[in-house]
Design a protein with these regions (language model features):
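A generic structural motif
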Residues: 65-71, 109-111, 225-238, 294-307
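Short helix-loop-beta junction
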Residues: 53-66, 217-228, 291-292
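Active-site phosphate/pyrophosphate-binding segments
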Residues: 2-4, 9-10, 15-35, 151-257
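Conserved active-site and cofactor/substrate-binding residues in soluble primary-metabolism enzymes
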Residues: 12, 49, 136, 140, ...
């Protein structure tokens, strides 16, 4: 994905959340029944990460929530099925139609005009996508699913007022990371500057933050940066192998690893580790990573007054997306 497209996609995260908040406030989800089980159907990696984040965040869920690529055999009239896709021509349209035929309540995050939307029945709740948005968003999927699940009394995590507050926080993050703000005052540019020219491991502890770490790695790969998402525990377990070798640490001003090859058999690109976390967990994560000068902790939600798990996750996701957009810039 080119830098301009990355920038536009990152800037739209708040708008996607706002669409979910408006849908909840306008009563779009009010007729959803309390389900026996919830199934999140998706074939896409970003949407799947959003689905995994929903499951991890909704610790108070009153019904089991599962993720699937196809419709499970058990799904029937007592269940609630979500379809999450960016592709309006996705074959997942057949799943949506089959869920409706079985009598399940269905929710579609609108991918735009095409077979998927056409497969929605009059009973399907269709969550609108912001105007001029070509793709879905991690934050938008999380907000839409949690807004619907809150209305269906599965969780209390995502009422309309909370989603609106989260959208405000994400919009404020987008302003702070806007292209007209330079390196001195732009936290996303500062993050990108630190990562540029490195292979990056993004780590997050626990199921929620592992999904954010994997999302960050996906954004960075879109920007052309080698990246991997994992847990803090797994990163620490591998720290001996990840640490720069003494030979690689020797600073040869005339050595270019992209032209001359790795130093003494070292890596083609130096390694950086970034841990993403919540304000509550940041002190502990910083303490664990303090011995490693090639690692840093990023906690964008520390700068936000509103304290809520959705704020922590969505503001971090917004900064990750903005930072990825700036990686291709010249240092």
């Amino acid at each position: 994905m080119d830098p301009h497209s990355l920038t536009l996609t990152a800037a739209a995260e708040g708008a996607h959340l706002r669409a979910a908040a408006s849908a909840a406030a306008d009563g779009l989800f009010d007729d959803l029944p309390e389900p026996r089980a919830v199934v999140l159907i998706t074939n896409e990696s970003r949407a799947r990460l959003a689905a995994e984040a929903v499951i991890a965040l909704a610790a108070d869920a009153r019904a089991p929530i599962t993720i699937a690529r196809s419709l499970p055999r058990f799904v029937g009239a007592l269940d609630l099925v979500f379809v999450l896709t960016d592709d309006p021509g996705d074959p997942i349209a057949e799943v949506l139609a089959e869920a409706d035929r079985r009598g399940a309540a269905t929710v579609l995050v609108d991918p735009g005009e095409g077979p998927v939307r056409a497969a929605a029945s009059s009973r399907t709740v269709v969550v609108p996508r912001p105007a001029m948005s070509a793709v879905g968003s991690f934050c938008g999927y999380v907000g839409a699913v949690l807004g619907a699940l809150t209305a269906a009394r599965v969780t209390a995590l995502g009422p309309a007022a909370v989603l609106d507050d989260v959208a405000d926080a994400v919009d404020a993050e987008a302003v702070a990371c806007a292209p007209d703000r330079d390196l001195l005052v732009n936290p996303a540019r500062q993050w990108a500057e630190w990562m540029r020219g490195h292979s990056v491991v993004v780590a997050g502890e626990g199921d929620v933050w592992r999904t954010v770490a994997e999302l960050a790695a996906a954004w960075l790969l879109d920007a052309g940066l080698p990246a991997h998402g994992t847990t803090v525990s797994d990163m620490l377990r591998a720290s001996g192998a990840l640490a720069p070798s003494p030979a690689a640490a020797l600073d040869d001003l005339f050595h270019d690893p992209l032209i001359d090859g790795p130093v003494d058999g070292g890596r083609m690109l130096p390694l950086s580790v970034i841990a993403v976390t919540s304000p509550a967990d940041a002190p502990a994560v910083r303490a664990r990573l303090e011995p490693f000068e090639w690692a840093r902790v990023e906690c964008p939600a520390e700068e936000v007054e509103v304290r809520h798990p959705l704020v922590d996750v969505c503001v971090t996701a917004a900064r990750v997306a903005a930072a990825a957009a700036y990686v291709p810039e010249e240092g």
